[in-house]
Amino acid sequence: MYAIAFLVVKDTQDYHPKGVQQAYTDIGAVLAKFGFVRTQGSLYINMNEDMANLFQAMNALKQLAWISQSVRDIRAFRIEQWSDFTDFIRN
């Protein structure tokens, strides 16, 4: 399982033609094409173990004309285990 996490800077409104919120939406749409699902905030996970898929997703993000000036930090990492404690905390 792989994850991608990123931070979009406030100045994105100067680079993206439709502003910060649309930038997040566009990033999510690109990642969804490669099977990534938003879990919280700017964290997207993918159950696919194929690193080539991860690279293809990153290359697709890189094609967005505004992204290099809008993302302060973007990281990809492998998740060994994923435990969802939401139900445990709520009950």
Curated annotation (Swiss-Prot):
- Which keywords does this chain's UniProt record carry? Hydrolase, Nuclease, Virulence
A molecular function annotated in GO for this UniProt entry is: RNA binding
- The transmembrane segments are none
Q: Which InterPro entries match?
A: VapD (IPR016368)
Stated family:
Belongs to the VapD ribonuclease family.
- State the protein's purpose: Cleaves ssRNA, mostly between U:A.
Provide the protein name.
Endoribonuclease VapD
Which species is this record about?
Haemophilus influenzae (strain ATCC 51907 / DSM 11121 / KW20 / Rd)
Q: Which gene encodes it?
A: vapD
